[in-house]
Amino acid sequence: MSYAIIETGGKQIRVEPGRYYDIELLPVDEQSTHTIDKVLLIHDEDDISIGQPFIEGATVEGTVIQHRRGKKVIVYKMRPKKKTRKKRGHRQEITRFMIDSINYNGKTLVATAATSSAEVVEDSSDEEE
């Protein structure tokens, strides 16, 4: 299993090719590709590369699926024994980001096509019946 740890939006996220993640809002259009070059760690089977703080030449490429808003967080302030109450809500702007590949030293780590192999298994079980 190959994965990388990247930094985006002030947070560190463990990402794998072929999966999507909700990250802080990226200033790019939907359905466009984006490259993140702040890669802190890459784990490829038995090989681990750690940056100080980032790995030079390592990138994570992905596609912006959509821009959306996160769950609403309610902030409620109240002073006891007074009639002072404030209720406010906040919804964070987030981007759903699909990881396409992890690139390092000319090597590209891409997700395997698990869905196509699952379809083959379903087709072979139909033929047996």
Curated annotation (Swiss-Prot):
One of its GO terms (cellular component) is ribosome. It comes from the Bacteria. One of its GO terms (biological process) is translation. One of its GO terms (molecular function) is rRNA binding. The keyword Ribosomal protein applies. Keywords: Ribonucleoprotein, Ribosomal protein, RNA-binding, rRNA-binding. InterPro entries: bL21-like, bL21-like_sf, Ribosomal_bL21, Ribosomal_bL21_CS. This is Large ribosomal subunit protein bL21. It comes from Microcystis aeruginosa (strain NIES-843 / IAM M-2473). The gene is rplU.
